[in-house]
Regions:
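C-terminal scaffold of the Radical SAM
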Residues: 1-153
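Generic leucine side-chain signal with a strong bias for well-ordered alpha-helical environments
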Residues: 27, 127, 171, 184, ...
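Short active-site-adjacent structural elements
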Residues: 137, 174, 191-192
């Protein structure tokens, strides 16, 4: 908000990237691993090959994971957002107005929307690709339904060509792609919006 109002300069993207890489390294050394681009949790296991943290979901925020996995949730309180199926809504922000609506037996919802299938698919990819679990490559626009994960890397398949390019650019993990999942590399985390657009074929 302060940047939009001109009170602070726009952050330099290269400086932000360098700080993120430093934070990732320091947190890794301290036993934390990323489970979503902006969220880290203490690991309970260490990958012997890399010496880096590996298993950590028991320490991750269940609330955050529900959001990034595109699960349903109910938000309670002034200004809270909710998401159930294709419906999304948000409550009035003013605490007095919120309390008055509840007292009068009225809905606290201020506004909402029903998401179409294209929007739901975009959000599923956009949110899922931000997690260390990544997303399944099968079912992305341009992929063929096959039991052979490696076939997704076939340059003749629309999405496969994009996936191969993302691997070549160091943005998604090649080994994970061979197992049928798009998982961001450290570089990919810095360019997650670009990766999402490429996976969606935009």
């Amino acid at each position: 908000a302060q940047v939009a109002r001109g009170e602070l300069p726009t952050p330099d993207p290269d400086d932000e990237a360098a700080k993120y890489e430093l934070a990732d390294a320091l947190l890794g050394e301290a036993g934390y691993a990323w489970y979503e681009i902006s969220n880290f949790a203490r690991a309970t296991d260490v990958d012997l090959a890399s010496g880096r943290p590996s298993t950590f979901y028991e320490h991750a925020s269940a609330h955050n994971l529900a959001y990034w996995r595109d699960w349903d949730w109910l938000g309670l309180g002034p200004g809270a957002h909710s998401h159930v199926g294709r419906m999304r809504w948000w409550n009035v922000k003013n605490p007095a107005a919120y309390a008055a609506r509840l007292r009068d037996g009225r809905s606290a919802a201020y506004a909402g929307e029903i998401l179409d299938e294209d929007t739901r698919e975009l959000e599923r990819v956009m949110l899922g690709v931000r997690t260390s679990e990544g997303i399944e490559l099968a079912g992305l626009p341009g992929t063929r339904q096959t039991g052979e994960a490696g076939a997704l890397l076939d340059a003749g398949v629309a999405s496969g060509g994009r996936v191969a390019a993302l691997i070549a650019d160091g943005l998604i993990d090649g080994a994970a792609a061979l197992r049928g999942r798009a998982i961001l590399t450290l570089r990919g985390r810095l360019l997650a919006d670009y990766v999402t657009r490429e996976l969606m074929g935009y």
